[in-house]
């Protein structure tokens, strides 16, 4: 009769490999090298077969043992979500199985509306709840940026203000019960927020970097932490661009909360929402029911994907 344990070799002699769980979660990734954690909390260094790179931080995976400290990742388990970006040349997986994206922004240095809108689109496409975090809210330059962010509140995206001296306490209720990821431009204070939320856990990241011989600070790679038994947090590297080439142009209106209710209401089924008569999108922008700038953004992304 076959053994019930997936790693058993049928020999009765105790073997440390047999105690290893056959599933794990990726908590950090450096190229084709990973750190995984099994349900009992044990961590292992992990590699992949055939130089696969289609794994992301947060992935739940099947593993096979190599020795007491190392495993091989065989495949990932079905994903609840996948957040990634893609330009004309390459695809970058950001995180898997997250339920909430926190886009960290601040008035200083210059915030990017382009990056914010693109990240929101990616979250909508992935079925991930999005929250905008206005960091450094005590800066005098904040008022003008906050006024711009209030528009996104009208679209259903909460805007949470944080200040360094508050130790990120205003974020904790928002994070609770979610698998969260912090994402934002470089210089927005994202790492400071993460450190405030994680406390002593950040001291362990140096050991992980050394174990993988990365020679780099771990903020150059996504890293997953447990805030409590119900809440996870992924700290991701800062970025300046968010390619959306993985999206389909025809699906874009569904990812705009301010336009999705108009899908199917144009006179022509193949309306490009530009010069056609009877365009519901144009009518909404002209009457003030929708933002002309948002319509221009939709048109621009459509051109980008079709070009």
From Swiss-Prot:
The cross-references to HAMAP family, in alphabetical order and at most eight, read:
GTPase_RsgA (MF_01820)
Function, as annotated: One of several proteins that assist in the late maturation steps of the functional core of the 30S ribosomal subunit. Helps release RbfA from mature subunits. May play a role in the assembly of ribosomal proteins into the subunit. Circularly permuted GTPase that catalyzes slow GTP hydrolysis, GTPase activity is stimulated by the 30S ribosomal subunit.
Task: Describe the location of the CP-type G domain by residue ranges.
Answer: 85-242
> Entry's InterPro entries?
G_CP_dom, P-loop_NTPase, Ribosome_biogen_GTPase_RsgA, RsgA_GTPase_dom
The organism encoding this protein is: Neisseria gonorrhoeae (strain ATCC 700825 / FA 1090)
* Residues where Zn(2+) binds: 266, 271, 273, 279
Q: Which UniProt keywords apply?
A: Cytoplasm, GTP-binding, Hydrolase, Metal-binding, Nucleotide-binding, Ribosome biogenesis, RNA-binding, rRNA-binding, Zinc
| Family under the similarity heading | Belongs to the TRAFAC class YlqF/YawG GTPase family. RsgA subfamily.
Q: What is the lineage of its organism?
A: Bacteria, Pseudomonadati, Pseudomonadota, Betaproteobacteria, Neisseriales
Q: Which PROSITE patterns match?
A: ENGC_GTPASE, G_CP
Q: What is the protein's given name? A: Small ribosomal subunit biogenesis GTPase RsgA
Any one GO biological process:
ribosomal small subunit biogenesis
Any binding details for the cofactor?
Binds 1 zinc ion per subunit.
In terms of Gene3D superfamilies, this protein maps to:
P-loop containing nucleotide triphosphate hydrolases, Probable gtpase engc, domain 3
What are the boundaries of the region Disordered? 1-21
- EC number(s) per entry: 3.6.1.-
């Amino acid at each position: 009769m076959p053994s019930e344990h997936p790693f058993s070799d049928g020999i009765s002699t105790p073997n440390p490999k047999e105690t290893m769980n056959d599933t794990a979660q990726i908590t950090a990734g450096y190229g084709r090298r990973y750190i995984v954690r099994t349900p009992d909390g044990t961590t292992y260094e992990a590699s992949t077969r055939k130089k696969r790179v289609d794994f992301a931080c947060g992935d739940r995976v099947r593993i096979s043992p190599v020795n007491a400290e190392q495993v091989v990742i065989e495949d990932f388990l079905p994903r609840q979500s996948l957040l990634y970006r893609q330009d004309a040349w390459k695809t970058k997986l950001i995180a898997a199985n997250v339920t909430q994206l926190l886009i960290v922004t601040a008035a200083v240095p210059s915030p990017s509306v382009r990056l914010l809108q693109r990240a929101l689109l990616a979250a909508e496409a992935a079925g991930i709840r999005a929250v905008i975090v206005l960091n450094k809210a005590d800066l005098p330059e904040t008022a003008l940026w906050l006024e711009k962010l209030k528009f996104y509140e009208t679209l259903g995206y909460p805007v949470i203000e944080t200040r360094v001296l508050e130790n990120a306490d205003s974020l904790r209720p928002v994070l609770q019960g979610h698998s969260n990821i912090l994402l934002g431009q470089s210089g927005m204070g994202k790492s400071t927020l993460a450190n405030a939320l994680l406390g002593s856990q950040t001291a362990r990241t140096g050991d992980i970097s050394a174990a993988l011989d990365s020679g780099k600070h771990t903020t150059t790679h996504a890293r997953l932490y447990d805030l409590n038994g119900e809440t996870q947090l992924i700290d991701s590297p800062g970025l300046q661009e968010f390619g959306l080439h993985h999206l389909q142009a025809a699906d874009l209106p569904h990812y705009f909360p301010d336009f999705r209710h108009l899908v199917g209401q144009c006179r022509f089924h193949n309306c490009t929402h530009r010069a056609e008569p009877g365009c519901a999108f144009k009518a909404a922008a002209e009457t003030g029911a929708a933002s002309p700038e948002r319509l221009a953004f939709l048109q621009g992304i459509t051109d980008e994907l079709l070009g």
